[in-house]
Structures are given as C-alpha cells and as structure tokens.
Amino acid sequence: LSDPRWALSGAWLDYDRDGDLDLFVANYLEYDEGKFRSFYAASGYPGPLSYNGVSCALYRNEGNGTFTDVTKAAGMHNAGGRAMSAVAADLNNDGWMDVYVANDSMENYYYENKGDGTFAEKGLELGLALGQNGQGVSSMGPAVADLDADGELDIMIPDMDYGSLLSKRGGFYQDLIGSSGL
C-alpha cells in the first residue's frame, strides 16, 4: 500500500465475508512533509490540532496480493476525521464486521456494516460518538469485550482525561465509566 497520509493504526477485518482479510487504516491528519506552519508566540509550536484532519481508508483485499481503496464506495470517507485508532468487531450482532474509530478532540465514528459492501455512520445515533458530557474527547485505543456477559460487546475508550466505558442498554450505548470503578 502506498498512502502518504499520517496513519496511526489499522484493523484487519473481513468486511465483505469473502474469506480474505481487508484493512481499515486509521489516518490522523493531513501533514505535508517539509511544509510547516509559522507560529510566533514563544510556546507556539504547532500541535496536531493545527493541521487538517483526513479520512481513514478501507482497502479491500483482492485475494491476489493486492488491495483496492474502497473508502468512498463503502461510505466511509470522512474528510475531517482525526483517527487515533480503530477496532473492528461485530458490534450489532448481525454477523458482519463493523468499525469503531476513536478520533482526537472530536466525535468518534461507528461504521455499521450494512452487509452489501457499504457502511452507515451511526455514532451519534447510538450514543457512541461523544464523551459523557456531550463533547468530543481525545480518544485513544478502543478495546471491545462483553464485560457484563449480556451478549452485547462493550467498548472501553481511554483518553487524555477520564475515558469512557460504553455499554449497550435498550438499543443505545451509555457511558458507565463513573459507576464502573475504573
């Protein structure tokens, strides 16, 4: 794969259930090598949020050692993303791999696999996009497991402050970090 974007992590998944592992790449931001922004204050070093976010990428494994970028066709193109990492799991228990993207200082994305080669972004709709106070947080590396043995995967998301423990309750995710003792 030849991709000039600043990638921070990736997740292998068989999103189309053809038996080949496809690759989701969590891209962070648009960074032009050799081109820097000028800041004049003494503490004015450009931090990551000084640069534009960039879309993640989904590469379909063609089964012959090559991959094809299907990000736009799959409905996963989001030009303003700032992905720190992603995890692939069947979060809605329909047998198809979904993708959860942890973004930096903005809403997180949940791409639900529709089973036809496309995804629908449903993070806000299901309570997976924002922190417990309704704000974007500096999400890092999400991990999934069925922590309460209810048959639904829960998502632990560390961040720069307190983190989130998202558990599905009545069709929506609730942040249980405060009551969990974590």
What does each model-identified segment do?
Residues L1-L182:
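Acidic, glycine/proline-rich Ca2+-coordinating loop motifs
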